[in-house]
Every structure is written in C-alpha cells, then in structure tokens.
C-alpha cells in the first residue's frame, strides 16, 4: 500500500489557489478512478484507488497547510506505512509555473507543510514532488494564496496531468524511475527555453 498526500488548505475560498496544487493533483487522480475524496479520516479527506496491482490511499489533509503533518503521521500510523511508502505533492515558488521536480528526500525548502511533516514524522527521508508556481517580486503570501491566472493555467493545468502520470510511475516503478522520466523532461524544457531567452536578449541589445 502507498499513501499519496496532496498539500493545500481546506475551504472553498482556497480552491484553485496556487498553494492548493497538491489538492488538484489528488482530485485528478481520484477523478480518473471515478471516486471522490469524501471520506474523512485522521483530519483528511481520503479515498482508495488501485494503480496496477497496488492499493493507494489518496489524502488531502484538512488541517491547513502548516499543520499537515498531524494528518500525515496519523494516516501512516493507521495504515502501518513506512516513510518510503509516502509520496507528498506540494507547490514550489522556486520552480517556474508548471515545472515538476521529484526528490527522494531532503529539507522542506521553506515549504511549511513539508516542514511540519518532517518535524512530526521525525525524518526527511521520504519522496516528494514539487509543482512550480513561480516566485513573485514581492508579496509571497498573497502569491501562494492567490488564484491561478489564465496565463499560468496554460502551464499549470498540463503540469497537473503530468504530475498524475508521475505518481503512477512512482507507484509502479519507484522514485528513481519517476525522477529519471519527469525531472529529465523538465531539464530538456529549461534547456530549450534558455537559448530562446538568450536570443531575445541579443535582439534587445541591438
């Protein structure tokens, strides 16, 4: 069994905000399996799906972002799961909108939901996937709690579907396989964008 946790804030006022990308990925996974996260358990909305032959619990903690660890640790204890059977999905301001990054472990990197999970779980040795939302010049709080713009949606909506596919690869093939497949895609995307940006700069300098 695996536990896939998407981080976000509960309530309609936070729906479709940048900070709730984790919830959006969970909802897409549930929709594909024609189920919904209506069951409430250990301060989370959950449901169970099957990926391949693997049973998977999808969870959206309802504790608010900064207390996500309360729900995650309770669910892991209930289902008797180890940290390597946990996969956390969250937003990341340090990545451009729509870019994914999968890691085997690591620090919270300023993401408070991840920070709380690490503190309460007592380890940072669990895989996670970050979905980029970009960093504003100022007003970080307003940015993460703001609604996704139409321009951003053109990048983020496809990334949500890509994140769904990445989850499936993680469940079936493991973290390294997911990293190899999806982090490499992001690298190629960045490499493609960099020459274009350099060309634009040359034109501006003329």
Curated annotation (Swiss-Prot):
Residues that coordinate or bind tRNA: 14, 64, 66
Single biological process term from Gene Ontology: protein quality control for misfolded or incompletely synthesized proteins
Localization: Cytoplasm
The protein's Enzyme Commission number: 3.1.1.29
PROSITE patterns on file: PEPT_TRNA_HYDROL_1 (PS01195)
Class of enzymatic activity (EC top level): hydrolase
Record-annotated site: Discriminates between blocked and unblocked aminoacyl-tRNA: 9
GO cellular component, one term: cytoplasm
Chief location bin: cytoplasm
Catalytic activity field: an N-acyl-L-alpha-aminoacyl-tRNA + H2O = an N-acyl-L-amino acid + a tRNA + H(+)
Chain segments carrying region Disordered: 182-206
Entry similarity comment: Belongs to the PTH family.
PANTHER family reported in the protein's UniProt record: PEPTIDYL-TRNA HYDROLASE
Subunit structure: Monomer.
Protein name: Peptidyl-tRNA hydrolase
């Amino acid at each position: 069994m695996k536990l896939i946790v998407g981080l976000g804030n509960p309530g309609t006022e936070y729906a479709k905000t940048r900070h709730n990308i984790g919830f959006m990925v969970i909802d897409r996974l549930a929709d594909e399996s024609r189920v919904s996260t209506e069951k409430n358990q250990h301060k989370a909305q959950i449901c169970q799906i099957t990926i391949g032959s693997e049973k998977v619990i999808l969870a959206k903690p309802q504790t608010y972002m900064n207390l996500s660890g309360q729900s995650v640790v309770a669910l892991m204890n209930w289902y008797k799961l180890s940290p390597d059977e946990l996969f956390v999905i969250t937003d990341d301001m340090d990545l451009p909108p729509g870019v994914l990054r999968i890691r085997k472990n690591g620090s919270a990197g300023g993401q408070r939901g991840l920070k709380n999970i690490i503190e309460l779980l007592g380890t940072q040795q669990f895989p996670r996937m970050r979905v980029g939302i970009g960093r504003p010049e100022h007003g970080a709080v307003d940015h993460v709690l703001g609604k996704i713009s139409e321009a951003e949606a053109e990048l983020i909506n496809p990334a949500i579907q890509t994140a769904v596919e990445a989850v499936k690869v993680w469940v079936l093939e493991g973290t390294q396989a997911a990293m190899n497949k999806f982090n490499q895609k992001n690298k190629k995307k960045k490499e493609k964008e960099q020459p274009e940006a350099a060309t634009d700069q040359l034109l501006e300098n003329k």
